[in-house]
């Protein structure tokens, strides 16, 4: 399989979690492209410098059951949301809720899901990318769908440390009307009578808000 588009190197590999019968794969492959003897090798290279580019893994939000990702269809990850916005995505770029196909009136981004936490399954450090792509997604949403959709980002700290990142943040607030709330939401629940999501969080002065 090709694990993801634009993989480097651009080569197919065997997904051992799905198929471990190598002999059967060799038998049915029409191009005779599977070579069982072509296994992992260790080589020693003499180089002048080393660049560390370990990549990253996606976090599974189901670890945090209070957000009910995987239970409530309208709770999605940023990657899921990018697919919704994409012209080649499941809704062909239309902003539609997975649960009922209707257009949402409010969208909330919850930052630091999986990072900067002490619970089991989380990491203690900042992912360093989420603030900027959340701002980008919120701005794209406001730009494409205008005043029809309210965009709110719930954050711990807006880490806009790169070149012109702070300017980008100011544009999101002042030009696009993106709302920023400094709070880490506690739970996401669904109102049974309406099917709408209800997000519970503490305001900056310690009050509970919905």
What are these regions (language model features)?
Residues 1-28, 36-44, 54-162:
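Rossmann-like dinucleotide/flavin-binding elements
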Residues 30-38, 45, 173-186:
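A conserved beta-strand/loop element that lines the FAD pocket in flavoprotein oxidoreductases
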Residues 46-55, 210:
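Short hydrophobic core segments
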Residues 47, 162-164, 189-195:
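Short, solvent-exposed polar/charged micro-motifs at secondary-structure junctions
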Residues 58, 66, 176-210:
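Phosphate/diphosphate-binding loops
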Residues 164-175:
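Short, aromatic/basic amphipathic alpha-helical patches
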């Amino acid at each position: 399989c090709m694990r993801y588009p634009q993989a480097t190197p651009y080569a197919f590999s065997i997904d051992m979690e799905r198929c471990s019968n190598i002999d059967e794969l060799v038998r049915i492959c029409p191009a005779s492209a599977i070579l069982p003897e072509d296994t992992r090798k260790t080589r020693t290279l003499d180089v002048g410098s080393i660049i560390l580019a370990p990549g990253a893994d996606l976090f599974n939000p189901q670890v945090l059951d209070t957000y009910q990702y995987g239970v409530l269809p309208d709770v999605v990850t940023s990657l899921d949301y990018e697919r919704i916005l994409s012209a080649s995505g499941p809704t062909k770029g239309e902003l539609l809720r997975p649960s009922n196909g209707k257009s949402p009136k409010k969208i909330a981004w919850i930052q630091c899901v999986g990072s900067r936490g002490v619970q089991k399954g989380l990491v203690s450090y900042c992912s360093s990318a989420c603030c900027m792509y959340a701002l980008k997604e919120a701005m794209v949403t406001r730009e494409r769908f205008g005043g029809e959709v309210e965009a709110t980002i719930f954050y711990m700290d807006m880490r806009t440390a790169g070149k012109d990142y702070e300017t980008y943040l100011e544009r999101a607030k002042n030009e696009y009307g993106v709302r920023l709330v400094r709070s880490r939401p506690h739970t996401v629940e669904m109102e049974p009578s309406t099917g709408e999501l209800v997000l519970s969080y503490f305001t900056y002065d310690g009050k509970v808000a919905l």
